[in-house]
């Protein structure tokens, strides 16, 4: 089937729209599908996503599309950018509409709710082994990407030619640098764990602790990410790159991060539900915490920071209790396998 678009993006939230804007600005005809027809009509009328990225004009090559069948028929390249808790559901909806030559990449950051499975496992369960798969991950705030500010990300997949095609599609000399990576597993994990650590950094700052504590959490958070990654077969070196250290530093230190702001609100004494309402958008780290905690427990991987965030979010603990517990841990060498 002939392409009428270079790529179709599923998910018209802030990040999906930002990626679609970047692709269209790079000269690629891009279809952007969203589950809410009214939202898509607003995009068509306003030529902007005023709900999530106000004030940023959609390029002419970006085409909002409310019909999923039309969107998936337009291109064999499909970029999924939806919250992790609906990732499987969207793939189920897309499955009967995919082309024979479809190739699936996602920028969703997270694991499967309840099970803690990687999204590649979810994709394989829904789609089988028929389609090439890839993941896009790295330190990106949607607003900056949409505004054309310099950004760098990584992409890895099951098919080398698909990975290289994605690099060519996404890379832009003046706005987006794309690095190919061969660690499909590692790139998926980094995007989930960094959200958990960002909540912890936000809680620390909300309590009133300083830069020393925040930096310690980032550093030890990287240790936790690497430890869990190695347990599932990822490469430790991946977590020193864009999808590990890069995403971790960005999300833990800048208030554009919803996860960091969520943690800040908790640290200042707000309850979990109250803090979520204040953010006003999906806080991926809330679900990611349970997902990562579940995976770590299943594998027997020690992740003290993640465990304390889990206790605050799901077991009624407080940020002060979490800090006290972490500080009271047994003294150990920095280079020991466990903290």
From Swiss-Prot:
Keyword Nuclease: no
EC number: 1.1.1.94
Signal peptide: none
Uppermost EC category: oxidoreductase
Cell compartment(s), UniProt: Cytoplasm
Catalytic activity reported: sn-glycerol 3-phosphate + NAD(+) = dihydroxyacetone phosphate + NADH + H(+); sn-glycerol 3-phosphate + NADP(+) = dihydroxyacetone phosphate + NADPH + H(+)
Binding site for sn-glycerol 3-phosphate: 109, 138, 140, 194, 247, 257-259
Annotated InterPro entries: 6-PGluconate_DH-like_C_sf, 6PGD_dom2, G3P_DH_NAD-dep, G3P_DH_NAD-dep_C, G3P_DH_NAD-dep_N, NAD(P)-bd_dom_sf
Keyword tags: Cytoplasm, Lipid biosynthesis, Lipid metabolism, NAD, NADP, Nucleotide-binding, Oxidoreductase, Phospholipid biosynthesis, Phospholipid metabolism
Active site per database record: 194 (proton acceptor)
GO biological process entries: carbohydrate metabolic process; glycerol-3-phosphate biosynthetic process; glycerol-3-phosphate catabolic process; glycerophospholipid biosynthetic process
Protein name (record): Glycerol-3-phosphate dehydrogenase [NAD(P)+]
Native source organism of the sequence: Shewanella woodyi (strain ATCC 51908 / MS32)
Lineage: Bacteria, Pseudomonadati, Pseudomonadota, Gammaproteobacteria, Alteromonadales
Gene: gpsA
């Amino acid at each position: 089937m002939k392409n009428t678009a270079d790529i179709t993006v599923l998910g018209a939230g802030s990040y999906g729209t930002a990626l679609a804007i970047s692709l269209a600005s790079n000269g690629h005809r891009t279809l952007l599908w969203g589950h809410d027809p009214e939202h898509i009509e607003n995009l068509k009328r306003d030529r902007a996503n005023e709900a999530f990225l106000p004030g940023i004009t959609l390029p002419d090559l970006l085409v909002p599309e409310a019909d999923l069948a039309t969107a998936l028929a337009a291109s064999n390249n499909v970029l999924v950018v939806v919250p992790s808790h609906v990732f499987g559901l969207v793939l189920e909806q897309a499955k009967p509409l995919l082309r024979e030559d479809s190739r699936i990449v996602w920028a969703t950051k997270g694991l499967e709710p309840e099970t803690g499975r990687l999204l590649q496992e979810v994709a394989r369960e829904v789609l089988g082994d028929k389609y090439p798969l890839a993941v896009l991950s790295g330190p990106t705030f949607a607003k900056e990407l949409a505004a054309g500010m310099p950004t760098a990300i990584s992409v890895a997949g099951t098919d080398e030619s698909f990975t290289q095609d994605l690099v060519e599609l996404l890379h832009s000399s003046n706005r987006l640098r794309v690095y190919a990576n061969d660690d499909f597993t590692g790139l998926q994990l980094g995007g989930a764990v960094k959200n958990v650590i960002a909540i912890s950094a936000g809680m620390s700052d909300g309590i009133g602790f300083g830069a020393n504590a925040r930096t310690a959490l980032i550093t030890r958070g990287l240790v936790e990410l690497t430890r869990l990654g190695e347990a599932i077969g990822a490469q430790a070196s991946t977590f020193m790159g864009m999808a590990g250290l890069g995403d971790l530093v960005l999300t833990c230190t800048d208030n554009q991060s919803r996860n960091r702001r969520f943690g800040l609100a908790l640290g200042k004494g707000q309850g979990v539900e109250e803090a979520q309402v204040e953010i006003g958008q999906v806080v991926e780290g809330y679900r990611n915490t349970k997902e990562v905690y579940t995976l770590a427990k299943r594998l027997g991987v020690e992740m003290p920071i993640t465990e304390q965030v889990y206790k605050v979010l799901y077991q009624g603990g407080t940020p002060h209790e979490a800090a006290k517990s972490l500080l009271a841990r047994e003294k150990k060498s920095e280079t020991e396998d466990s903290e």
